[in-house]
Amino acid sequence: MEKIIVSGGHQLNGTVRLEGAKNAVLPVLAASLIASEGESVIKEVPVLADVYTINEVLRNLNAEVEFDSTTKTVNINASQQLETEAPFEYVRKMRASVLVLGPLLARYGHAKVAMPGGCAIGSRPIDLHLKGFEAMGAEIHVGNGYVEANVNGRLQGAKIYLDMPSVGATENIMMAAALAEGKTVIENAAKEPEIVDLANYLNKMGANIVGAGTETIRIIGVEKLRGTEHMIIPDRIEAGTFMVASAITGGNVFIENAMREHLRSVISKLEEMNVDVIDENGGLRIIGPEKLKSTDIKTLPHPGFPTDMQSQMMSLMLRAEGTGVITETVFENRFMHVEEFRRMNANIKIEGRSVIIEGISELQGAEVAATDLRAAAALILAGLVSDGYTRVTELKHLDRGYVDIVDKLAALGADIKRVDENGVVVQPLYVTAAKESNEIAAD
């Protein structure tokens, strides 16, 4: 079993460059299926396990997909006849695979997609995707582990109110509506920057979408979309993670291409904790204080505080003076990392949907297991300031969302390495796969 070993006590200094946003690239790649003419060229694609997974889904649907991990570019040609069924073996690894449902339904009037593992209707808002399709005239059948959608002719524009501002539902409905007949209005839409990025991509392809980034999105359907070129926005969650890394170590780190407008809620909370966030040409500089001051955080849909930064901020609050409270309102059961923090001597307790953090915890290195993607990063961050060695396992979660995080932290001054069960330094499997695919392409 691979693990990341961190030795605490090293201040971080230097410059780090962000990757393209994972949460933006997956829907953009799925949306490429709508283009019945031309090729799409997607730039600043992060070299992540999830990107390889969605590329395999697209290839299985008969799209031509080439990923050059060196230039971080994906070329997609979906102009040929596509398959309209995505089987379980390709979708089981990633819930975002359900995003191919809207594009296939809009283009062909039929789509059948396996339900990703653990994605039960009701507990996750995929029901909002399906209600949106039904409002546009589709017939939905759920059974035997699949979602099947059919419509006679074109989808019809509709007025759709989302019971909650689900990012995935907003994206899927927006993609489907791009080819629908007439006007679609999505109310209580998600406002995340990734929604805006997807709308920009669709509009470059020939769609007519206005209002992305607000609670009301209006789409006038068109006859067809064409392939285009698009650059993915920087990853705001990776930015937030490195902000915390600098702050927790009392460091001075410049985050290249970080965008303040995508990070206002995170910056606000960091500044409340005495962290300096300085605008510089091309990014943000984060200077950690001698003493961190605790604060309270409540996760909310954008532009509120992002749930994907909750666990990282928890690690920071472990080192802050005073008592802090984090309340999670977006997802259930997102405090599984608390028990791992306790193994590191954290003074922390759960009360309902809140966590109470008593600083200053004298953190001790321990063997801990990542429970999800962001928890993996949070445990590494805590390890940066722990006494002794922290060993983080279950790295499959980390590889879904962070590119070269070990190398990037090491370049900033962290004592950190990734090793196999024999203690030999290794790279993530997706990096090995990327090198092999590029060597094959070169041949």
UniProtKB/Swiss-Prot annotation:
Q: What residues form the catalytic site here?
A: 119
Alphabetically sorted, this entry's keywords are: Cell cycle, Cell division, Cell shape, Cell wall biogenesis/degradation, Cytoplasm, Peptidoglycan synthesis, Pyruvate, Transferase
Q: Name any GO cellular component annotation.
A: cytoplasm
Known EC number: 2.5.1.7
An example Pfam family from this entry, by short name, is: EPSP_synthase
> Cross-referenced InterPro entries, in alphabetical order?
Enolpyruvate_Tfrase_dom, Enolpyruvate_Tfrase_sf, MurA_subfamily, RNA3'P_cycl/enolpyr_Trfase_a/b, UDP_GlcNAc_COvinyl_MurA
The residues listed in the UniProt record as binding UDP-N-acetyl-alpha-D-glucosamine, with positions renumbered to this chain, are: 95, 124-128, 308, 330
Q: Which reaction does it catalyse?
A: phosphoenolpyruvate + UDP-N-acetyl-alpha-D-glucosamine = UDP-N-acetyl-3-O-(1-carboxyvinyl)-alpha-D-glucosamine + phosphate
Which residues are recorded as binding phosphoenolpyruvate? 22-23
Pathway entry: Cell wall biogenesis; peptidoglycan biosynthesis
Q: Which family does it belong to?
A: Belongs to the EPSP synthase family. MurA subfamily.
The UniProt entry, under NCBIfam families, shows: murA, PRK09369.1
User: What is this protein's name?
Assistant: UDP-N-acetylglucosamine 1-carboxyvinyltransferase 1
Recorded name of the encoding gene: murA1
